[in-house]
């Protein structure tokens, strides 16, 4: 499930502390083998009707009663081989009294006939008088535990099974589900689609998507790859959003050491989706907002979303968390493989910049609602889907990589995927594989980063001794070690004394001083080069060193740190001139965007002219930052500039940003554009 979380689920529903109930993996009374769903989907009535048959073996030698998760579902009857069984419904549970006592060696199939009008788990989209152009759709969203609101089932990720779906829908619609399409049968004004998933998986990954779809076919290495889009989309539209999928399949198969393990890979767009995407096994649901025209690139791209959801086919689907407290194993790996794709396909330094964003989200989450990554205390498991599993999860995996090195990390990653293929996993499984593969004891690492909350708070300062030609770097950990940890921190210190010198240190004390040789007083000293570790760093530097670092640090993330640090300095012409110079000299667009943000925060008197002069030739993402910065300057020149952007730029997001800026500086001028703006068709109605 993608990380488009609304204010991180209201800051994880404010807190996630030990005052909440403790949760661990629930016991199982039976081992699920197969599930056969045979239903009619009535979108207009919002109704599911039919049956589900569960095949399982008991764990006990005297099994007389079994239960299924079933909430607000009308049960018409339960049977074994046509023989009716008695049953009771109690809250979210359906209890079934078996016809006799069964043992662990028996295989049982229980059939449940039912009707549901679900308000969760299965959603219906219909056109109405307010939105006459809406699609007619029905689709599922099972994660975390919502599928049992529309079909009785075992609804927890500690068991895997195969399943089939026979879906009867209106003859004008298609019904897509997991696995292979076995058959399509035409009935009177209806069609029945029979799908079968042959690889055992957890029930929240069950997918049903019903709608008026067009299938765009693709393939990778003999595996069908399909894009289910709307009738007004063509092949180019589908490929614009999803066309890199085959290359991603190739890359992820290589990096995990496991060839894509399922029958096919479909991506189905849906309307009114509450998330960005959902990694239902072999049939990912994607928000239809990801469809776009070329004009909105690079501000909008589907690549990250597509990579994230596809990565889940290995981490989340093939290997699935055994319980919700360990769900970071799903989301952290998917988020990190998204970065690996950027590193592989685009630019390793851009991937590092994206990782810097995850690092920032990790620190923000810790400040807002401190909790460990593996969290057993919660009211509802959906509370856990926050930055601690997505952003921090990916940061943890990156730190493992940096500590073990690429060779050890990628060998361990492949061994982890192969060892636990098609199984459930917990954090201990990952830790053990990396320890066995590399010989490293990782107790300390997982204890401080996974099982305990918090991030280090570090103050840094240094002195240079000209006589000894030594730099003395003093580091202090200032966090409350009682509530978090005294962190063990392997880091790289970079010193520029006319030459770039890097030194590996291991900082594991409250305070420590490290010395390094330097032939002259350093032009720049950096702690944790590239910012690999989530932390709050206080490192006061003189303006000249910050400007030098902005221009000369070899790693873009360190140049970004300098740009951000300059926001806290006194605004001077020297700084303004340096920032303007770097808007053209800096090679990376993402560093230039940070420079624009710094320039805006310093509010130079002639800032508008400098920003407008720097606009042409910039990456659209930098242009958008410039437009946003111009909101601070209410002048006729800026108004004319914004009107020119509105009338001539092709990227919807630039036009939208210019309109918002114009509202702030000249509301009357913006009102004159209102009718025009309302008539524009734009991506996600951004204009």
Which residue ranges define each predicted feature?
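Ligand-binding face of N-terminal immunoglobulin V-set domains in extracellular IgSF glycoproteins
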Residues: 47-71
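N-terminal, polar/Ser/Thr-rich
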Residues: 13-49, 133-137, 157, 439-448
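Non-catalytic accessory/interaction domains
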Residues: 169, 311, 407, 420-609, ...
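Solvent-exposed beta-hairpin/edge-strand motifs
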Residues: 63-84, 172, 490-498
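Long, helix-rich interaction regions
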Residues: 12, 581-594, 602-605, 609-687
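A surface-exposed beta-strand-loop module
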Residues: 71-131, 509-521
């Amino acid at each position: 499930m993608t990380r488009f979380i609304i204010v991180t689920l209201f800051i994880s529903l404010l807190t996630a502390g030990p005052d909440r109930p403790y949760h661990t993996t629930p016991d199982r009374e039976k081992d699920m083998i197969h599930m056969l769903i045979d239903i009619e989907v009535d979108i207009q009535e919002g109704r599911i009707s039919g049956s589900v048959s569960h095949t399982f073996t008991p764990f006990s030698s005297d099994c007389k009663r079994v239960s299924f998760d079933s909430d607000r579902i009308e049960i018409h009857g339960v049977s074994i081989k046509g023989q009716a069984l008695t049953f009771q419904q109690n809250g979210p549970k359906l209890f079934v009294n078996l016809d006799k006592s069964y043992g662990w060696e028996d295989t049982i199939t229980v059939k449940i006939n039912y009707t549901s009008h679900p308000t969760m788990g299965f959603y219906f989209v219909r056109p109405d008088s307010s939105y006459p152009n809406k699609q007619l759709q029905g689709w599922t969203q099972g994660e975390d535990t919502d599928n049992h609101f529309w079909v009785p089932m075992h609804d927890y990720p500690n068991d895997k099974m195969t399943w089939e779906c026979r879906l009867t829908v209106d003859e004008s619609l298609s019904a897509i589900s997991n696995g292979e399409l076995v058959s399509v049968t035409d009935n009177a004004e209806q069609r029945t689609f029979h799908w079968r998933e042959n690889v055992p998986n957890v029930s929240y990954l069950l997918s049903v998507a019903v709608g008026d779809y067009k299938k765009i076919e693709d393939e990778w290495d003999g595996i069908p790859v399909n894009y289910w889009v709307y009738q007004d989309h063509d092949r180019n539209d589908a490929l614009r959003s999803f066309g890199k999928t085959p290359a991603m399949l190739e890359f992820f198969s290589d990096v995990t050491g496991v060839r894509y393990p399922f029958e096919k890979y479909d991506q189905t767009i849906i309307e009114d989706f509450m998330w960005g995407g959902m990694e239902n096994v072999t049939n990912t649901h994607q928000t239809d907002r990801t469809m776009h025209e070329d004009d909105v690139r690079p501000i909008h791209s589907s690549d990250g979303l597509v990579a994230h959801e596809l990565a889940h086919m290995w981490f989340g689907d093939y290997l699935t968390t055994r319980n919700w407290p360990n769900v970071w194993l799903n989301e952290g790996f998917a988020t990190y493989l998204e970065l690996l794709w950027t590193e592989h396909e685009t630019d390793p330094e851009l991937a590092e910049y994206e990782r810097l964003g995850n690092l920032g989200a990790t620190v923000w989450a810790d400040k807002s609602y401190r909790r460990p990554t593996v969290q057993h205390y919660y009211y509802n498991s959906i509370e856990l889907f926050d930055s601690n599993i997505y952003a921090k999860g990916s940061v943890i995996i990156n730190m493992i990589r940096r500590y073990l090195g690429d060779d050890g990390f990628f060998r361990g990653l492949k061994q982890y995927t192969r060892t636990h293929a098609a199984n459930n996993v917990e954090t201990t499984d990952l830790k053990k594989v990396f320890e066995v593969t590399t010989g490293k004891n990782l107790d300390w690492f997982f204890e401080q980063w996974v099982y305990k909350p918090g991030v280090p708070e570090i103050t840094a300062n240094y002195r240079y001794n000209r006589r000894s030609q030594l730099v003395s770097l003093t580091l202090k950990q200032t966090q409350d070690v009682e509530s978090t940890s005294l962190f063990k921190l392997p880091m790289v210190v970079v010193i520029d004394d006319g030459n770039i010198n890097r030194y590996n240190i291991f900082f594991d004390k409250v305070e420590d001083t490290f010395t390094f040789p330097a032939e002259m007083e350093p032009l720049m000293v950096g702690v944790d080069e590239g910012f690999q570790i989530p932390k709050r760093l206080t490192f006061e530097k003189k303006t000249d060193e910050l400007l030098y670092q902005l221009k000369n640090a070899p790693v873009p993330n360190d140049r970004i740190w300098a740009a951000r640090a300059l926001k806290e300095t006194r605004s001077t012409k020297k700084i303004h001139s340096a920032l303007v110079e770097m808007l053209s000299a800096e090679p990376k667009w993402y560093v230039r965007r940070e420079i624009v943000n710094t320039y805006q925060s310093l509010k130079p008197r002639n800032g508008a002219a400098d920003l407008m002069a720097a606009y042409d030739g910039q990456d659209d993402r930098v242009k958008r930052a410039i437009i946003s910065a111009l909101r601070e300057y209410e002048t006729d020149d800026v108004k004319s500039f914004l009107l020119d952007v509105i009338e001539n730029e092709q990227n919807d997001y630039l036009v939208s940003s210019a309109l918002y800026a114009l509202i702030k500086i000249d509301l009357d001028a913006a009102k004159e554009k209102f009718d025009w703006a309302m008539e524009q068709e734009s991506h996600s109605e951004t204009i």
